Design a protein with these regions (language model features):
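N-terminal subdomain of nucleotide-sugar transferases
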Residues: 1-48, 52-54
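Short His-centered aromatic/hydrophobic patch
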Residues: 95-100, 119
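Glycine-rich phosphate-binding loop signature in dinucleotide/nucleotide-binding domains
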Residues: 84-90
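Short, Asp-centered acidic motifs that coordinate Mg2+ and/or phosphate
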Residues: 91-92, 114
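A short, flexible beta-alpha/helix-coil linker loop
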Residues: 9-13, 63-66, 122-124
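Generic beta-sheet signal
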Residues: 6, 41, 61, 118-119
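Active-site proximal beta-strand in glycosyltransferases
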Residues: 3, 108-124
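A short, charged, and often flexible helix/loop element on the N-terminal side
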Residues: 54-83
């Protein structure tokens, strides 16, 4: 299955070392292990992908470093990701929930794409 993993959260570098980054890497790693064709679409990559994920196709839609209207920039990046995926036509979109991103909702509505909205938050 062709799966697009989307992370439009600028606070999470998908190739980083923070907990959310490691979680994304583990999900992608498991999907690949199960034989799926996975591509990562993110606004922030981090510096170096883990060696075992270096072959996973990755597209970045970076946000400006200093932006007066960061929320608008995030929404525009999400639109750019959605536009790319509308032409790529994955079988499934797996989106890590982030504010101002409507990638999965848009593709489900316009293309009928199946999806997973991953909501992952610490319990306090």
């Amino acid at each position: 299955m062709r799966i697009a993993y989307v992370c439009a959260d600028p606070g999470i570098p998908v190739h980083g070392t923070k907990g959310a980054s490691v979680h994304i890497q583990d999900v992608v790693r498991e999907l690949v292990r199960r034989g799926h064709d996975v591509g990562i679409h993110a606004v922030r990559l981090g510096e170096h992908p883990p060696a075992d994920l270096a072959g996973v196709p990755t597209w970045t839609h970076p946000l400006p470093a200093h932006c007066a209207d960061r929320e608008k920039a995030q929404a525009q990046a999400a639109d750019a990701i959605a536009e790319r995926l509308e032409s790529d036509a994955p079988d499934l979109v797996w989106e890590r929930y982030s504010l101002f991103s409507t990638v999965l909702a848009r593709l489900a509505r316009t293309r009928g794409v199946r999806g997973v909205l991953e909501v992952n938050a610490p319990l306090i």
